[in-house]
């Protein structure tokens, strides 16, 4: 069984991964001209934003 500290560390890493992924999508969006591809990347980026919020909430719950 994981301790709260271990779980918090794990999900802090997950949070950082999600932030990094969102940044990659944003950088690609800025450099592309193809509206279809941009639309897909924006959708994925928005999903990453949701993952970031969920990871933050999960970390809060673990730490409480």
Where are these regions (language model features)?
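Non-heme di-metal
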Residues: 1-64
């Amino acid at each position: 069984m994981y301790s709260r500290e271990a779980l918090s560390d794990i999900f802090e890493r997950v949070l950082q991964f999600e932030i990094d992924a969102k940044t990659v999508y944003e950088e690609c969006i800025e450099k592309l001209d193809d509206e279809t591809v941009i639309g897909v990347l924006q959708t994925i980026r928005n999903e990453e934003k949701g993952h970031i919020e969920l990871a933050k909430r999960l970390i809060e719950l673990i730490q409480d």
